[in-house]
Amino acid sequence: GEEVGLTLQKRFRYIREAFSNDELTQIYKLDETKLPRYPLGWEPWLQTALDTIQYQTETEELIFYVGEKAYKEELEARGFEVHLEERRFGISATMIRENPSKYWKYIAQPFRRQFTKKVLIMGSASNGKTTLAKDLARFYDAPVSLEYAREYQIKNNVRDDELTPKDYYYLLLGQYDQTSKLIDSSANRGLVIADTNSLVTKGYYDYYMEVEGQDTSMTDTFDNLFVSILSKEKWDLILFVQPIGSYVNDGFRDMTMADEEIRTSFSNYLDQLR
């Protein structure tokens, strides 16, 4: 798991999540960092495992269920009852890691977020990003996370140039939450496309809040939130769309952005941020 970014802590949390509704199953974490690598170290590994589950030899019965014959032999040699559970689907963890999309239906739901390919389409407004995102999503039969800011502005009836620092906090959190939920949804079959991300929100914040001369404490709060969210966003591919075509007035856009010089300058700033 480590080779694909699945640390011990992630694996532990994801498995706990998978069994969250199972009251009869308990999940433990066994750190093998200081133990000899397999096939060595059976004795210290076994003792660590027994200590971890707080096994009481005099009052409890312990049965191991394993997927490898070698494991069964080693544990039986040490006096434990062992059941060998052979693979029923002809797949392995290695096969999934090498080609997750092929074996997508066999990947437990919490682990799918780790193997999802995430494509970001970013750029300034009114340049065809949304159309491109929808077309790609339709072609690849993938879910798409559209611009949360537009939904937010329609709901609150607020234009680009009327947004406050507090609004931008909500935009950062809302966009990240929307995309994260899509990645974790049943609609995700291994590919998710996003129309925008925190970098674009940061670009607009810098553009409008600098003009309005907001105090530094608000900017510091926003920047801390931005850095935190940006560190969690992992993209496999970023498509940067240049500002080509007419700037459409949809009732919420700031039409000063229709000026070619301003539009190009803002697009260049976004390019620098990424």
Specify the residue positions occupied by each region the protein language model found.
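Nucleotidyltransferase catalytic core that binds NTPs
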Residues: 1-117
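Hydrophobic anchor at the beta1->P-loop junction of P-loop NTPases
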Residues: 121
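P-loop (Walker A) phosphate-binding loop of NTP-binding proteins
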Residues: 124
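Conserved glycine(s) of the Walker
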Residues: 128
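Hydrophobic positions on the alpha1 helix immediately C-terminal to the Walker A/P-loop
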Residues: 132, 136
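Conserved substrate/cofactor phosphate-moiety recognition/catalytic segment
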Residues: 138-180
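Glycine-rich phosphate-binding loop used to anchor ATP phosphates in small-molecule kinases
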Residues: 169-233
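A glycine- and Lys/Arg-enriched "phosphate-lid" helix/loop adjacent to the NTP-binding pocket
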Residues: 208-273
